Design a protein with these regions (language model features):
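Eukaryotic intrinsically disordered, low-complexity regulatory regions enriched in Ser/Thr and Pro
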Residues: 1-166, 198-275
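Internal, well-ordered interaction modules that form the hydrophobic cores of assembly/scaffold domains
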Residues: 161-201
């Protein structure tokens, strides 16, 4: 019988960009500026499998493992970014195969989010109809075509290319700041980029004031350059970090009581990160 890790170690089929659109990324002056990022050094296969060993070694109970992923060539056709959203959400069953014992969760379209930098998709807490509580985003994400954005754009000698690289990061950083989310991600037809955000300390002469998050749409918190890790769609095998495994573990982090922004975080280990 397959374990959860066995299923999540399978590769994610790469979408087929037959008529993929080109052009600039969206922009808003209200977004937080991003000009740098830094490697998320402890987001590794070794740390994740150690931290979540009990979950990952459990028997797979999500039905036919072959249903996780995409099989038909037509399903892989991605002419624009909107078409990439359902492709990315096909991985959502990997985020819902265990009961976290708290509130229901769902990985779905970002139209549920309501702020100046709404994500394309994300992990949401789903309240019961009787509770009348709002739908809270725990993990904001953006979809981008590799014809418009890829991580290596940061290394370009052209300022215009580096500026385009920064725009999606500014958008998801702003969404994270407004929603008080510690984690986020960007997913393209070629790779998943996981992100962790950290608040910047402001001295007494700084201008930061008020609440750290503002649902009215004004960002009242400053962030350090985001930490990132890149996982390619072609990655597979239990010794490697795959897109499915990375999404699964990121959802565990965001829903396990370690989802709020802070000024620093403990190393990724079983002692500090348990669902």
């Amino acid at each position: 019988m397959s374990t959860i890790h066995d299923v999540l170690a399978r590769p994610s089929p790469e979408p087929y960009l037959s008529w993929a659109s080109h052009g600039p990324n969206v922009y808003s002056e209200s977004w937080l500026p991003v000009s740098e990022w830094t490697p998320w050094v402890d987001f590794t296969i070794q740390n994740l499998t150690s931290t979540y060993a009990q979950v990952l070694n459990a028997h797979w109970s999500g039905g036919d493992p072959q249903s996780i992923g995409i099989s038909g060539r037509f399903d892989l056709l991605v002419p624009d970014e909107r078409s990439l959203v359902p492709v990315a959400i096909r991985e959502r069953r990997a985020a819902s195969i265990i009961n976290l014992g708290q509130e229901p969760l769902g990985l779905g379209p970002g139209s549920f989010g309501q702020n100046i930098a709404s994500p394309d998709l994300g992990l949401f807490s789903v309240p019961t109809p009787a509770s009348q509580e709002k739908l809270d985003i725990l993990l904001p994400g953006l979809t981008k075509l590799s014809t418009k954005w890829y991580p290596e754009m940061r290394l370009s000698e052209h300022q215009s290319v580096r500026s385009e690289w920064a725009l999606p990061l500014s958008q998801v950083s702003t969404c994270a700041a407004l929603s008080d989310c510690r984690y986020g991600f960007l997913i393209t037809d070629e790779a998943l980029v996981v992100l962790r955000f950290t608040k910047k300390r402001i001295d007494v002469s700084g201008t930061q004031s008020g609440d750290d998050s503002d649902p009215a749409g004004v960002v009242n918190v400053e962030l350090l350059p985001p930490e990132y890790a890149v996982i390619h769609m072609s990655s597979s095998g239990k010794d490697n970090l795959t897109v499915k495994l990375a999404v699964f573990c990121l959802c565990l982090m965001a829903s396990g009581g370690h989802d709020k922004l802070d000024y620093g975080y403990p190393p990724l280990s079983p002692d500090d990160y348990q669902p």
